[in-house]
């Protein structure tokens, strides 16, 4: 079987088919792969990732402890597996960057996995792309998202947050969804503005053209990010765009910078949360008793930067016309 890397060129061409030929050629030529994890080995690459160990609930009243156990994080069959289980577990209340030793302890009723490139790798502008299969069930909340490496403009959300994929309660009852499979929409969002409760966000929900469940098979998510511009794609189709006219930061450190806070290096992370406000307050409410074990599978994650426009990253981005 060909390796994922060997198939990369063909896959780029397939994705580009949704755009005009001229744009596809420029995009394929100028995007340079700068970082990737194909998850082809038998264990997590610790030179690329740090598992988070915390039980704080992510600030969203989530119900899991994130652990560094193979029960919750494993690499097998060419995929990263982030696996949630129902089990009582006690661990550090907060991630190490939020708390001094000795870390306070907290007990939760679920365990799961979360990995980050924090302190290892971060990027300013580029294309972030991954192939993933989210789990379904009331109470599941898988995500691939980005946070500022250094919080130059201040604490959350003054320095921004980029949520590329959030899959909340997939398959649960949904009266406003199209189709007959229940909740089939995935969320993308950006967070910015001032400290809570004055924080702001823009978000969108997107379903597959077939209205099928995203949890039924793997799909490819793409973020193209340049100075003052973000474009989001699912399986090559653009579904959302934000520009610097849509965001701001209340930080005095921005000094009237019109593209702040999304003009700094961000790191990437992936996790599978259980419960939390966004999940438990919607669809069938709460956490289903049979939702675990649940697994969030990621086939690969690849990050590119624009070789023809290293400063702003805009020249490689696809055109304004929405893909058909």
Where are the language model's segments positioned?
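GH16 jelly-roll
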Residues: 25-324
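Bacterial N-terminal signal peptides
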Residues: 6-17
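N-terminal signal peptide c-region/cleavage motif recognized by signal peptidases
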Residues: 19-21
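Positively charged n-region of N-terminal signal peptides that target proteins for export
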Residues: 1-5
